[in-house]
């Protein structure tokens, strides 16, 4: 007798959600297609129906995080107004994207350049960091931020604070709404020219 239990229909999006969790738990290199098949509850051939392989899943996952970050730089508040206000907006929104796309950004922050996809992701991350550093330099040049902290160092410290969220934040915490504001207040109250 055939089993007529309805199976969950998998989409690329639902497969990606499972994949990101497995990559974050086991690491990209430590994950096999068999691991993904087991975690998703579908056959490997079903996975291959949606994607060409594990590296394509990685590219889709880190691409989602990167698209969220680069989308911030195109927002009106990131391109119009004084540099310090644009920078504050970018910092706040970066923290918000990290919180809303936590598993995807966590994966992005863990890539090391071992594959072509990881190298691509690292290059895009460097480009994003560079654009934020340029905003910070402009705010320093305007006299809105302290000039005694080298902009490259300040940018690294900002990203260090934001990126550390992946290590301690867990979805469902009541403090989620206040995290982005706390990052902005802590960063800019410490960086503002006095």
Whereabouts are the PLM-identified features?
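Key DNA-contact positions within bacterial/archaeal DNA-binding proteins
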Residues: 45
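A short His-aromatic
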Residues: 48-51, 55
